[in-house]
Amino acid sequence: MSLYEATKDLHHACEAHALGGRMSKGNVTPQEWADWLWAFRCLHSVVDQSLPAHMARDGLLAADLSVLPTARPSKAALTFAAGLVGHDVTGAAYVLHGAHRSGGRVMAPILSKRGLPCSHVVYIDNEA
């Protein structure tokens, strides 16, 4: 079974979540978007160290966050990120970059129309 197949139900659960539903419709607040991006950045602070430089999202997430309200730190993201330290992060990288490459391409145009920054979903290397 592929990782995609194994996580398909989780993806659908995210889309059915209240915040996920608002995000997909572009109805997320700037504060919610900041909090979401902060959690992504927390995870990328661990994952990006194991990836080629062109895959790094930390600087792009920092740029996106710089124009948003101050994010509220997520204990869940901090705990999950700490659990990744010292372990193979291939699976986490797959999920994070899949979210940016697939979901981000769908949601970025919607969120950008609302003035919410989405530079973290732009990849210089289209094969990344």
Predicted regions and their residues:
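Metal- and O2-centered redox machinery and metal/ROS homeostasis
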Residues: 1-128
